[in-house]
């Protein structure tokens, strides 16, 4: 995928030829009722090549244990556990580091640098371990490169970072635990009887048996709150199944074609899946990464999804690019996933049906397309000319959707509506 700086015209005359203003911002773009694009293609990262060596099994370190891990350099990314990270590395130091890693436990550290208003890199206090599951080494024109697919595993806190004689940084980290909060109603003696048969209503007759059983169990369990000093709605705020149902409802508003079967059933894995696909800035994402409880993480994600209504250009902050109603999934990962371009830049890309206030740079290209069958065109903010992402256009007439936008998360800023008295909403939401 291209970078906007490499395709800028050299003079004003060429700029007039290459610059195209998106002049259909006001038109209503109908969402296609059927998406016939194979959503498994983006998850395979086929642009990296099909002959990669794959590894099986997974490496998990003991919670609270201290580990020494090599640090992934030159990649500014807050990795979420469970998130896929594709990489293309060219520097000899990096190639050597990962060549050694694949013969060991294949695990490295991805540091989560907190954002700094001045633009300088700050000291990272947290991060995520990543494990390589596919690897390919190649040589072209005398230059060695490695292509990697890795996945985030566990959160950690940074204790110390030291640079070795070969220039590779080693991080001493402590693996952070996942706190499983006990069910506050589990102590009630009659709770095991909640699976008893209940009469079916017209609604329950059309509900799948497994989902109906779960709903009945949850409703009856919360009904037991009448035996305590707190009302049921208080317990529902901290019930993992209730929170997951509320989040799924929001996700279905984003993507009508979303299937619940494609989502994790474990609250922890589910909360991480949602965190990885939320189009939020680094400040909010880092706050989510610090949370050690799936229930609290889900509560914060709900707050974010409820209150963030639109996405603006991060650079000029006043230019609205798209709204959450335009978000949809064109990948099994969800509406947003990480991809890497031929130059090694990793972009977390959000797919939306419609975007506004953008200019297109250059001509469409299918080279290294992250979505096979679509050509990409670089998109810039119309106000400040910041790189915002790409417009994807189908190269075949029968491909649906015929066009969409891929917006890079690093260029977006979620908009928090003002309060009743005109006061801007808190950027930290429920955190």
Swiss-Prot record:
Gene Ontology MF terms: metal ion binding
Database matches in PROSITE patterns: CULT (PS51788), LON_N (PS51787)
GO terms (BP aspect): cell population proliferation; embryonic pectoral fin morphogenesis; fin development; limb development; otic vesicle development; otic vesicle morphogenesis; proteasome-mediated ubiquitin-dependent protein catabolic process; protein ubiquitination
Tissues expressing the protein: Highly expressed in brain, head, vasculature otic vesicles and developing pectoral fins.
UniProt GO cellular component terms: Cul4A-RING E3 ubiquitin ligase complex; cytoplasm; nucleus; ubiquitin ligase complex
CDD domains: CRBN_C_like (cd15777)
Compartments (UniProt record): Cytoplasm; Nucleus
Pfam families referenced in this protein's UniProt entry, alphabetically: LON_substr_bdg, Yippee-Mis18
Positions annotated to bind Zn(2+): 313, 316, 381, 384
Record's keyword terms, sorted: Cytoplasm, Metal-binding, Nucleus, Ubl conjugation pathway, Zinc
List of residues binding (S)-thalidomide: 368, 370, 376
SS bonds (residue pairs): none
Region listing for Disordered, in residue ranges: 1-36
Quaternary organization: Component of a DCX (DDB1-CUL4-X-box) protein ligase complex.
Note: Thalidomide is teratogenic in human, chicken and zebrafish, but not in mice. Binding of thalidomide and related drugs changes the substrate specificity of the human DCX (DDB1-CUL4-X-box) E3 protein ligase complex, leading to decreased degradation of endogenous target proteins and increased degradation of other proteins that are not normal substrates. This is probably the underlying cause of the teratogenic activity of thalidomide, possibly due to abnormal regulation of the BMP and FGF8 signaling pathways.
Name by which UniProt lists this protein: Protein cereblon
Name of encoding gene: crbn
């Amino acid at each position: 995928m291209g970078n906007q700086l490499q395709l800028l015209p050299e003079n004003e005359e060429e700029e007039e030829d290459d610059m195209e203003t998106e002049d259909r911002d006001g038109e209503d773009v109908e969402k296609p009722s059927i998406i016939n694009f194979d959503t498994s293609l983006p998850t395979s990262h086929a642009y990296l090549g099909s002959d990669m060596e794959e590894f099986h099994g997974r490496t998990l370190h003991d919670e609270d244990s201290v580990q020494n891990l090599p640090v992934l350099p030159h990649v500014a990314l807050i990795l979420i556990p469970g998130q896929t990270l594709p990489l293309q590395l060219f520097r000899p130091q990096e190639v050597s580091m990962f060549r050694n890693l694949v013969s060991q436990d294949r695990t490295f550290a991805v540091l989560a640098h907190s954002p700094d208003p001045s633009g300088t890199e700050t000291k990272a206090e947290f991060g995520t371990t990543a494990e390589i599951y596919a690897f390919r080494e190649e040589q072209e024109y005398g230059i060695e490169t490695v292509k990697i697919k890795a996945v985030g595993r566990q959160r950690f806190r940074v204790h110390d970072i030291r640079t070795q004689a070969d220039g590779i940084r080693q991080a001493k980290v402590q693996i952070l635990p996942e706190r499983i909060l006990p069910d506050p109603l589990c102590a009630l003696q009659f709770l095991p009887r909640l699976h008893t048969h209940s009469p079916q209503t017209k609604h329950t007759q059309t509900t799948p048996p497994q989902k109906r059983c779960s709903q009945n169990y949850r409703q009856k369990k919360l009904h037991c709150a009448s035996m305590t000093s707190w009302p049921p709605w208080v317990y529902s705020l901290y019930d993992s199944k209730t929170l997951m149902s509320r989040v799924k409802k929001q996700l279905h508003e984003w993507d009508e074609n979303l299937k619940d079967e494609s989502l994790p059933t474990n609250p922890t894995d589910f909360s991480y899946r949602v965190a990885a696909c939320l189009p939020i800035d680094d400040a909010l994402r880092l706050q989510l990464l610090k949370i050690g409880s799936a229930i609290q993480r889900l509560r914060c994600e709900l707050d974010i999804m409820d209150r963030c209504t639109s996405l603006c250009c991060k650079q000029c902050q006043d230019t609205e690019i798209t709204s959450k109603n335009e978000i949809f999934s064109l990948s099994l990962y969800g509406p947003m996933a990480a991809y890497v371009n031929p130059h090694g830049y990793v972009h977390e890309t959000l797919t939306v049906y419609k975007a506004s206030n953008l200019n297109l740079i250059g001509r469409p290209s299918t080279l290294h397309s992250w979505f096979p069958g679509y050509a990409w065109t670089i998109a810039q903010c119309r106000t400040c000319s910041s790189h915002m992402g790409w417009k994807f256009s189908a190269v075949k007439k029968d491909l649906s959707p015929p066009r969409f936008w891929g917006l890079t998360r690093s260029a977006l800023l979620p908009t928090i509506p003002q309060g009743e008295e005109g006061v801007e909403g808190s950027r930290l939401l429920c955190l």
